[in-house]
């Protein structure tokens, strides 16, 4: 049986170098790997066929802070550049607009890579543990933060509960693929309170905001229940859920403490407001999310 822990972290929780005599391998005994999947809340614009991550360039391509939707570093960038205690290399397959399974919840464009597509990219690249990414069960942490678009796109659907069951089946089908490839450490990030985004507050009635909040809660409850079943089924797993509602609400309830005039303004500099735009968190919320993940794995990965 695997070990399943739920963590609410704050409260309880590119360049290619000159040719060398031999290939540079990220195989120092202390090197760790952060292998992530998700949507625009996690994307850094990484292309696994491009420049590979290294100690001096942990995102690989593009270099820090990457191509993010935060105005600067997002939670992935913070983890590998500020919260790491040793060299931690990011292989980030997240893709903006992603849903878990595009046949269940279509993304905003058909070209968007779903969680299924992202895992397929992993399977076709670093799953085989190549010389440039010799990860193993002990030194690799697999992170998944997806569901914002799944919930956001169908919370209103009268068949939401049925769709949620299908989403979870697909989600944990992908985790099974990762497990079968050798993944044993998993951190799953919950869907944050998207009903508090400026977009939802400005464009939805109070009743609809409450309905979307309920849909978020249902998603996160299903995530926890399915993770417990997944760890019961598969041996040797250490899995933790980070409740992203804690860092989000910490900032949104105290905006001036984080350099913002209020909880609803947004600015593409990622700093003047808590929001980068009307749906994506800025730098400070991303820092808090990263801190939450680091706290959950303190003493092992961070």
Curated annotation (Swiss-Prot):
Gene Ontology cellular component terms for the protein in this record: extracellular region
Protease recorded as keyword: no
Stored Pfam families: Lipase_GDSL
Glycosylation sites: 84, 101
Compartment(s): Secreted
Gene Ontology MF, one: acetylesterase activity
Group of enzyme by EC: hydrolase
Signal peptide (UniProt feature, chain positions): 1-21
Keywords for this protein: Glycoprotein, Hydrolase, Secreted, Signal
EC number(s) stated in the UniProt entry for this protein: 3.1.1.6
InterPro entries, per database record: GDSL, GDSL_lipolytic_enzyme, SGNH_hydro_sf
Reactions it catalyzes: an acetyl ester + H2O = an aliphatic alcohol + acetate + H(+)
Chief site of localization: secreted
Family, similarity comment: Belongs to the carbohydrate esterase CE16 family.
Role this protein plays: Acetyl esterase that acts as an exo-deacetylase. Liberates acetic acid from xylo-oligomers.
Stated name of the protein: Acetylesterase
């Amino acid at each position: 049986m695997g070990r399943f822990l739920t963590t609410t972290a704050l409260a309880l929780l590119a360049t290619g170098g000159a040719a060398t005599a031999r290939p540079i391998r990220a195989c120092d005994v202390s090197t760790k790997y952060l292998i992530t999947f998700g949507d625009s809340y996690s994307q850094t614009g990484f292309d696994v066929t491009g420049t590979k991550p290294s100690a001096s360039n942990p995102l690989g391509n593009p270099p820090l802070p990457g191509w993010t939707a935060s105005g600067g570093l997002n939670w992935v960038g913070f983890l590998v550049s500020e919260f790491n205690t040793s060299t931690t290399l990011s292989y980030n397959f997240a893709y903006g607009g992603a849903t878990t399974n595009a046949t269940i919840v279509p993304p905003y464009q058909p070209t968007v890579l779903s969680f299924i597509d992202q895992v397929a990219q992993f399977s076709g690249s670093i799953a085989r543990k190549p010389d440039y990414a010799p990860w193993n069960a002990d030194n690799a942490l697999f992170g998944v933060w997806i569901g914002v678009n799944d919930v956001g796109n169908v919370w209103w659907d009268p068949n939401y509960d049925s769709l949620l069951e299908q989403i979870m089946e697909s989600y944990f089908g992908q985790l099974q693929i990762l497990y079968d490839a050798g993944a044993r450490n998993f951190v799953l990030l919950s869907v944050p309170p998207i009903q508090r985004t400026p977009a939802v507050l400005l464009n939805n009635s109070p009743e609809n905001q409450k309905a979307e909040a309920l849909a978020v809660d249902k998603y996160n409850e299903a995530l926890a229940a399915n993770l417990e079943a997944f760890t019961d089924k598969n041996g040797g797993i250490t899995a933790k859920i980070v409740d992203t509602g804690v860092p989000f609400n910490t900032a949104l309830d105290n905006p001036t403490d984080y350099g913002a005039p209020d909880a609803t303004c947004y600015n593409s500099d990622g700093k003047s407001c808590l929001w980068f735009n009307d749906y994506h968190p800025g730098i400070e919320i991303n820092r808090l999310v990263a801190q939450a993940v680091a706290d959950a794995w303190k003493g092992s990965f961070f």
